[in-house]
């Protein structure tokens, strides 16, 4: 996971999800993983950012993307949900002005296979690839803190 490489992580269950708190350099970081179904996660994410008074433009949502090759990473600010039900839910609750870190999981080939594909576990080699990406994201958080998108992507894509 993104937080597994961090030291002194304090976790708690609150606001409909799991919150992890840790220091990254001089910054206090909070991560949130909703306990809701993907298509309803916007409700708990809205509770989280409202409770801590975060502005949406300080939020980074990390999500899977069928339209990207496995392990490919893209980052963007704002925009459409691209058909992703989790993003649709978030958009409906907090608007579209937040960062999205998209991690490719490959498209299964036909629309009929999409639900099964996104709900199934990764195969062994796929899991290794995704874990490597998460580790590189964790290692390079400082670039996100400084909004250095290009440098972040270069490091994460290695």
Each predicted region: which residue ranges?
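Active-site oxyanion-binding pockets that recognize sulfate/phosphate
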Residues: 123-127
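Short glycine-enriched, charge-decorated loop/helix-capping segments at active-site entrances
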Residues: 74-80, 118-122
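Short, conserved glycine- and acidic-residue-centered signature motifs
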Residues: 83
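Nucleotide and nucleotide-moiety/phosphate-recognizing core
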Residues: 1-77, 88-99, 109-113, 128-158
């Amino acid at each position: 996971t993104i937080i597994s490489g961090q030291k002194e992580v304090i976790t708690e269950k609150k606001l409909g999800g799991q919150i992890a708190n840790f220091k990254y350099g001089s910054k206090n970081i909070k991560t949130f993983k909703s306990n809701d179904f993907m298509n309803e996660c916007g409700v708990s994410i809205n509770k989280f950012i409202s409770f801590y008074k975060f502005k949406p433009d300080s939020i980074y949502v990390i999500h899977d993307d069928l339209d990207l090759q496995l392990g490919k990473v893209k980052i963007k600010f704002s925009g459409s949900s691209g058909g992703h039900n989790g993003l649709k839910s978030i958009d409906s609750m907090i608007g579209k002005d937040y960062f999205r870190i998209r991690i490719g999981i490959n498209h299964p080939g036909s629309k009929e296979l999409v639900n099964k594909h996104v709900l199934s576990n990764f195969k062994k080699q796929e899991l290794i690839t995704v874990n490597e990406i998460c580790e590189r994201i964790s290692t390079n958080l400082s670039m996100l803190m400084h909004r250095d998108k290009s440098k972040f992507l270069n490091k994460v894509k290695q």
